Amino acid sequence: MCNTPTYCDLGKAAKDVFNKGYGFGMVKIDLKTKSCSGVEFSTSGHAYTDTGKASGNLETKYKVCNYGLTFTQKWNTDNTLGTEISWENKLAEGLKLTLDTIFVPNTGKKSGKLKASYKRDCFSVGSNVDIDFSGPTIYGWAVLAFEGWLAGYQMSFDTAKSKLSQNNFALGYKAADFQLHTHVNDGTEFGGSIYQKVNEKIETSINLAWTAGSNNTRFGIAAKYMLDCRTSLSAKVNNASLIGLGYTQTLRPGVKLTLSALIDGKNFSAGGHKVGLGFELEA
């Protein structure tokens, strides 16, 4: 099995405690279904309560398992069309090759990326290249794993300017119920997170970040509590006194309701708080 995470997935458990179960300032509906022929359909709609703006997207996915191929098509209300073709675990176990294209009919703009990733038990590597003959940007990352320790590097190189535009490092440790993650971005942004699964019902997370040459330190704590197998409560707070609360209820198999609220602790009586409603249906 290929268990080494990608660079973007380092510290994912802590991020999930902070991000999942919330949807401040919007009404969101997600629908997922699968046809008899194996085509997967998913659609999502958002309506933002402060601006009244609404947006949505539609995605279809079809897998040809015998050949390791996956075809994905995407459309959103900004009239952007996307097509993705991936080929996985056929040329070599853990190797995935992807062609990702985007087309905007209104402007005629076209863009694309070639992606490759290779994952094994002790390492994972990957690279993306923009399809741009004027000077593509090359993205790359690598993660090494040894007895629970993880070390990662991420970079991007602008060939048009012959300049390294991104230079990130990460170091962490992962156990069954505990994760530690630290990172440095471009030598100026520093951050870290701690994830702890206290027991089967309680998950906690701490997040800390700061920027060199600035006094702006960001700090937050979050927790998730499972009331039962169908109901969970989430809460988080940061050093800006923003308090987030979330309630998730599985009404029946495949039907989930999420209620959330963001409270400004510094200006509690002034208003400006945000609420959110989410509805997920899978059939």
From Swiss-Prot:
Record carries keyword Chaperone: no
Domain of life of the source: Eukaryota
InterPro entries with a match to the protein in the record: Porin_dom_sf, Porin_Euk, Porin_Euk/Tom40
Positions of crosslink type Glycyl lysine isopeptide (Lys-Gly) (interchain with G-Cter in ubiquitin): K53, K61, K109, K110, K163, K266, K274
GO biological process, one term: behavioral fear response
Positions of modified residues (Phosphothreonine): T4
One Pfam family from the record: Porin_3
Tissues/organs with expression: Expressed in erythrocytes (at protein level). Widely expressed. Highest in testis.
Residues the entry annotates as binding NAD(+): L242, I243, G244, S260, A261, L262, I263, D264
PTM annotation (Phosphoserine): residues: S241
Keywords of the record: Acetylation, Ion transport, Isopeptide bond, Membrane, Mitochondrion, Mitochondrion outer membrane, NAD, Nucleotide-binding, Phosphoprotein, Porin, Transmembrane, Transmembrane beta strand, Transport, Ubl conjugation
Gene3D superfamilies: Porin
Residues in coiled coil: none
Cellular localisation: Mitochondrion outer membrane; Membrane
Gene Ontology cellular component annotations, sorted alphabetically: extracellular exosome; membrane; mitochondrial outer membrane; mitochondrion; nucleus; pore complex; synapse
Entry-annotated residues carrying N6-acetyllysine: K12, K15, K20, K90, K266
PTM note: Ubiquitinated by PRKN during mitophagy, leading to its degradation and enhancement of mitophagy. Deubiquitinated by USP30.
Disulfide pattern: none
Primary subcellular site in the record, as a coarse category: mitochondrion
Role noted for this protein: Non-selective voltage-gated ion channel that mediates the transport of anions and cations through the mitochondrion outer membrane and plasma membrane. Forms a high-conducting channel with a stable open state and a voltage-induced closure with a mild preference for anions over cations. Involved in male fertility and sperm mitochondrial sheath formation.
PANTHER family for the chain: VOLTAGE-DEPENDENT ANION-SELECTIVE CHANNEL, VOLTAGE-DEPENDENT ANION-SELECTIVE CHANNEL PROTEIN 3
Domain notes: Consists mainly of a membrane-spanning beta-barrel formed by 19 beta-strands.
Quaternary assembly: Interacts with ARMC12 in a TBC1D21-dependent manner. Interacts with MISFA.
Name the UniProt record assigns to this protein: Non-selective voltage-gated ion channel VDAC3
